[in-house]
């Protein structure tokens, strides 16, 4: 019993720290990242089991899923970096908030990604 508790103790402390120290917006982004991993895994599993007959459709769906994951990770990193900078120093606020800028970059890059994904479908 002690070996199992020794294995799960670090994991439980990481989960407790994550729940206590992470705000709701970052938890929501993390949930969306988990959703993208599940959808990408389902698409890949379907391609392995059934096949990739409309290959453009498979590539478009899978690449858009992976691309959205990468864009969302960049958005999460930008938000985390802005939180660290805002807590460490109080500078004069810029014209556009760094949070708004990160969100606009996320939206624009997501639109461009999905435009190319839909265009690739044919």
Curated annotation (Swiss-Prot):
Entry protein name: Probable dolichyl-diphosphooligosaccharide--protein glycosyltransferase subunit ost2
Pathway linked to the protein: Protein modification; protein glycosylation
Cytoplasmic side: 1-30, 76-101
UniProt-annotated location(s): Endoplasmic reticulum membrane
Superkingdom field: Eukaryota
GO CC annotations on file: cytosol; nucleus; oligosaccharyltransferase complex
Gene behind the chain: ost2
Similarity field: Belongs to the DAD/OST2 family.
Predominant subcellular localization, coarse grouping: endoplasmic reticulum
Self-association and partners: Component of the oligosaccharyltransferase (OST) complex.
Membrane topology designation: Multi-pass membrane protein
Protein's job: Subunit of the oligosaccharyl transferase (OST) complex that catalyzes the initial transfer of a defined glycan (Glc(3)Man(9)GlcNAc(2) in eukaryotes) from the lipid carrier dolichol-pyrophosphate to an asparagine residue within an Asn-X-Ser/Thr consensus motif in nascent polypeptide chains, the first step in protein N-glycosylation. N-glycosylation occurs cotranslationally and the complex associates with the Sec61 complex at the channel-forming translocon complex that mediates protein translocation across the endoplasmic reticulum (ER). All subunits are required for a maximal enzyme activity.
GO biological process terms on file: protein N-linked glycosylation
Keyword tRNA processing listed: no
Keyword tags: Endoplasmic reticulum, Membrane, Transmembrane, Transmembrane helix
Membrane topology, Lumenal segments: 52-54
Residue ranges of the TM segments: 31-51, 55-75, 102-122
